[in-house]
């Protein structure tokens, strides 16, 4: 019986490799992948071959499946800078009309191409300059290519696309290349097309006219939803960055009772109900594989079509919009003798509403401070943060919004966990020690960072409600027994999925069969793995691009020494005993890794001195920016 293995290659030099069986168990197989021209993750089968002049059969292997060989768009850098070539592609015969060869035509020159995938060897790719360059100063190119053959030392590839020159001054090209490298260049063309067609069908029109989606239209589609469109009764407002167009969340605060020693308020958090728009225009089957919007320094790549993210789903002022709403009934107790206040959450309810936002404010905007409802909301939120969910230092509107998002994410997570459904975040958060000596701003950032980098898991697949399952999240640093994401459904698929499920368990809306199929598909284990992988790639891409943009716009930061805080530690025992430190630099509001061999034992939340350095990297960009520790001599 033939044996099947998978090859695992750890570097492009092929100096570290091993084989596994199909269950990913290591096996003692010694076929040299260079001799057999194998790529990382190739599936091979062991076969017996007759040896010449003997009756002995010798075991050999042949490739039965190869992801790399089938990939038509492998990203890499074509090395043209020094005009170094590696021979030519085979010569081709030119035929006359009778079919007879009349002369030999030289093939294109071969240039080295370095794949972005560090497990792949250098390729040779035929390339011909389109225009003469008398200065002979060529730039390396970001390209994609496909595998052609591998007969000699280097595999041969075929160019499929030229993205642009490797040049720090053309950052857009670098962004496009990185999207390809991290498999994030996912099209939403079909999503857009379906949306446009369904809108035109709905209004029996040959063109898209968003003016037809009036407030009256929004109100008429789901008349059973609670109507909160009267701006005199409901002062609902958003608070976001000044350039925001996709308003996910909004707030209102109403006094609903008072006595001599107590005042009662209803604090409402409104989240754009993207799911109702998906249902209204029949878009569940058209959703792409984008799991999140991507925010780059100069552009935004949205998860949803722009018509949805910046218009229909966005909580724009003076426009009727669907909102999933959390109403919190709060009692504020006044102590006359000490002039102190205490706060109690009396009740939390979830409902669907149609809202009419009064104002789209930006953080710390002057007119925001003139709104008496904002002042009340700020003071009540500050009291809540001292007692409920987590200690969060609130000194401005940005902190207030961040805390209210944590609050809603937490209470929705408790609901989902109680009902054994939804998507939660895994427990990989370490307790924040008291007296760590961190500034409150750093404390807030670290709490938010831990939540954003946690991995998701499907509750149905992981939680045993009859026992204390080790899979149940326990976010100790935030004093949380569960946590999820639901407050950003315009930009994150997990939030959209949890939004659907929260409405389901509270009987707020009867979704279609297509919606349930969408939910079941994306909460399967393989799709949650896909979400986690892509979210990690997106965070890495955004961080790298932010660093590069910062260097281009503020080059003097390279000369400066910064204070950093260690917020995560990982020991790589199998990699020369190196330690990877994740460091937060408060002054720059960025996180960077420092990888080093060290005898010094750092602990979480230790503060260190660090600098940004540039390293040459001809295979990626002209300078790679890394954070390094500054060691006092």
Question: PLM ranges: what are they?
Answer:
Residues 1-271, 275-319, 396, 597-598, ...:
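Charge-lined substrate channels and their catalytic hotspots, especially those that engage the 3′ end
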Residues 26, 411, 429-430, 437-633:
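Structured C-terminal cores of nucleic-acid metabolism proteins
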Residues 10, 24, 31, 82-83, ...:
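Asparagine-rich low-complexity intrinsically disordered tracts
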Residues 109-111, 324, 579-581:
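Short beta-strand micro-motifs in enzyme catalytic cores
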Residues 154, 168-169, 278, 335-337, ...:
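Intrinsically disordered, low-complexity acidic/polar segments
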Residues 17, 28-31, 127-130, 145, ...:
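Feature marking long nucleic-acid-engaging regions of large polymerase/nuclease enzymes
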Residues 63-64, 159, 336-345, 538:
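A broad structural signal for short, well-ordered beta-strand segments within beta-sheet-rich domains
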Residues 160, 174, 178, 196-200, ...:
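Generic detector of well-ordered alpha-helical segments enriched in charged/polar residues
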């Amino acid at each position: 019986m033939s044996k099947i293995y998978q090859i695992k290659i750890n570097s492009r030099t092929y100096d570290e490799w091993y084989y596994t069986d199909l269950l990913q168990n290591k096996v003692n197989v010694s076929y040299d992948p260079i001799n057999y021209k194998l790529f990382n993750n190739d599936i091979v089968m062991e076969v017996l071959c007759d040896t010449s002049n003997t009756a002995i059969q010798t075991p050999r292997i042949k490739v039965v499946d190869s992801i790399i060989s089938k990939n038509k768009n492998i990203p890499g850098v074509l090395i043209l800078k020094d005009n170094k070539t590696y021979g030519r592609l085979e010569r081709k015969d030119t035929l006359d009309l009778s079919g007879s060869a009349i002369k030999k035509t030289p093939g294109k020159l071969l240039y080295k191409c370095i794949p972005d995938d560090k497990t792949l060897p250098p390729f040779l790719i035929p390339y011909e300059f389109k225009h003469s360059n008398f200065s002979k100063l060529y730039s390396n190119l970001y390209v994609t290519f496909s595998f052609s053959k591998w007969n000699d030392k280097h595999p041969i590839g075929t160019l499929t696309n030229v993205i642009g020159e490797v040049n720090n001054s053309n950052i857009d090209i670098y962004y496009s290349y990185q999207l390809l490298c991290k498999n994030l260049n996912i099209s939403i063309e079909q999503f857009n097309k379906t949306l446009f067609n369904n809108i035109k069908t709905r209004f029996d029109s040959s063109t898209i006219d968003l003016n037809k989606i009036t407030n009256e239209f929004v109100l008429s589609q789901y008349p059973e939803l609670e109507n909160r469109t009267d701006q005199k009764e409901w002062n609902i407002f958003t608070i976001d960055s000044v350039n925001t167009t996709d308003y996910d969340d909004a707030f209102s605060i109403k006094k609903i009772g008072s006595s001599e020693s107590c005042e009662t308020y209803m604090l409402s958090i409104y989240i754009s109900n993207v799911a109702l728009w998906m249902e209204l225009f029949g878009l569940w089957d058209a959703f792409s594989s984008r799991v999140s919007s991507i925010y780059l320094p100069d552009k935004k790549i949205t998860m949803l079509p722009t018509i949805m993210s910046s218009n229909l789903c966005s909580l724009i002022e003076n426009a009727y919009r669907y909102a999933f709403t959390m109403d919190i009934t709060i009692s504020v107790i006044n102590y006359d003798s000490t002039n102190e206040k205490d706060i109690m959450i009396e009740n939390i309810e979830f409902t669907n509403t149609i809202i009419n936002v009064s104002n789209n404010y930006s953080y710390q905007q002057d007119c925001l401070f003139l709104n008496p409802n904002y002042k009340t909301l700020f003071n009540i939120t500050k009291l809540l943060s001292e007692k409920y969910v987590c200690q969060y230092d609130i000194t401005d509107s940005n902190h207030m919004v961040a805390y209210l998002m944590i609050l809603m994410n937490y209470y929705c997570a408790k609901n989902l966990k109680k009902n054994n459904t939804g998507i939660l975040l895994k427990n990989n958060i370490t307790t924040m020690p008291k007296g760590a000596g961190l500034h409150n701003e750093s404390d807030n950032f670290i709490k938010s960072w831990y939540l954003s980098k946690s991995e998701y898991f499907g509750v149905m697949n992981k939680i045993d409600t009859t026992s204390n399952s080790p899979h149940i999240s326990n976010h100790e640093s935030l004093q949380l027994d569960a946590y999820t994401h639901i407050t950003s459904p315009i930009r994150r698929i997990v939030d959209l999925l949890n939004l659907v499920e929260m409405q389901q368990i509270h009987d707020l809306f009867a979704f279609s069969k297509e919606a349930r199929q969408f939910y079941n598909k994306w909460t399967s284990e393989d799709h949650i793995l896909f979400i986690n992988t892509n979210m990690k790639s997106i965070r890495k891409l955004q961080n790298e691009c932010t660093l590069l943009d910062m260097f281009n716009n503020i080059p003097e930061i390279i000369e400066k020494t910064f204070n950093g805080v260690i917020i995560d530690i990982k020991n790589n025992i199998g990699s020369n005993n190196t330690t990877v430190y994740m460091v937060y630099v408060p002054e720059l509001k960025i996180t960077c890794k420092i990888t080093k061999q060290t005898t010094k034992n750092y602990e979480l939340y230790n503060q260190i001195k660090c600098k940004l350095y540039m390293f040459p990297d001809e295979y990626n960009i002209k300078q790679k920016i890394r954070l390094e520790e500054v060691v006092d001599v």
